[in-house]
From Swiss-Prot:
This is Phycoerythrobilin:ferredoxin oxidoreductase. Keywords: Oxidoreductase. GO terms for molecular function: cobalt ion binding; phycoerythrobilin:ferredoxin oxidoreductase activity. Belongs to the HY2 family. PANTHER family: PHYTOCHROMOBILIN:FERREDOXIN OXIDOREDUCTASE, CHLOROPLASTIC. Catalyzes the two-electron reduction of the C2 and C3(1) diene system of 15,16-dihydrobiliverdin. One of its GO terms (biological process) is phytochromobilin biosynthetic process. InterPro entries: Ferredoxin-dep_bilin_Rdtase, Phycoerythrobilin_Fdx_Rdtase. Its EC number is 1.3.7.3. It catalyses: (3Z)-phycoerythrobilin + oxidized 2[4Fe-4S]-[ferredoxin] = 15,16-dihydrobiliverdin + reduced 2[4Fe-4S]-[ferredoxin] + 2 H(+). It comes from Synechococcus sp. (strain CC9902).
Length: 257
């Protein structure tokens, strides 16, 4: 199956892709805002290739949904589906540095080994109490509500810790009925709770002065530079679509600040 997407806000519909309901929830939650398409080159709006062996080829599809608003520099969803090889939704909201907001991050990954699922409101500067306190006071109760229902995903690397909040919800789930049930009954409502809080914080956010903007922008760049360098999807995307396409996608779409 092939499809054409002319704009980054055109709907994404990938047959068999398990994270479709999550993307639809997010797009629906954003509808009250004044959404404008975010500029994404045609080659990254929709890409299909073949992977696997000659005897058992696998069609892989990567699509990008993206928009911008007055307070969000970029909202983007990287959607990847390669049958049993991989199914991914990486949904990130990059706020404008004119507003004292964290990032929203949802990373939902299915691999042959299982599901790896992460949600967070990620700080631009974790050491800045003025930036984090109002967020964490509201985030931690939501985190506590859902983490008790999920197995812990394990430790995160020390070098990554500055980029995650104490409300980082991170789990690994098995393939099959047990994992699917937890995704539907726990992970999806948790995703929507995190996103609802983020949109509530954004609605209340007021513009900051130039010095504060510069401080936040510096922190945002630290985050995006780190993510671009360490993107765990690099190997998978390179295998699916080649190195040149992958590096351009990472640096000009996913982490383009």
């Amino acid at each position: 199956m092939t499809t054409t997407r002319h704009s980054s806000t055109d709907s994404v519909n990938i047959p068999g892709w398990g994270w479709q309901p999550f993307l639809e929830d997010a797009v629906q939650a954003l509808q009250p805002l004044n959404l404008e398409p975010y500029p994404v080159a045609n080659d990254f709006l929709y890409k299909q290739d073949q992977t696997g062996s000659k005897a058992k080829p696998i069609t892989v599809t990567t699509a990008t949904w993206a928009c911008k608003t007055d307070k969000f520099r970029q909202v983007r969803a990287a959607c990847v589906y390669g049958g049993t090889a991989a199914s991914v939704l990486n949904f990130v909201i990059n706020p404008s540095a004119r507003f004292d907001l964290p990032f929203f991050g949802g990373d939902l990954v299915t691999l042959p080994s299982g599901h790896l699922l992460a949600l967070d409101l990620q700080p631009a500067d974790k050491s800045d109490e003025a930036h984090t306190q109002q967020v964490w006071e509201k985030l931690i109760p939501i985190f506590e509500r859902w983490r008790s229902k999920l197995p812990d995903g394990g430790p995160i690397p020390e070098e990554a810790q500055p980029f995650f909040s104490p409300g980082f919800l991170w789990t690994r789930l098995p393939l099959g009925d047990e994992g699917d049930q937890l995704i539907n009954s726990v992970v999806r409502p948790a995703f929507n709770d995190y996103l609802s809080l983020y949109l509530e914080l954004a609605e209340a956010a007021k513009p900051v002065g130039d010095d504060r903007r510069d401080h936040l922008l510096k922190g945002q760049r630290r985050y995006t530079d780190y993510r671009a360098e360490k993107d765990p999807a690099r190997g998978m995307l390179t295998r699916f679509h080649g190195s040149d396409w992958t590096e351009k996608y990472i640096h000009t779409v996913l982490f383009d600040l």
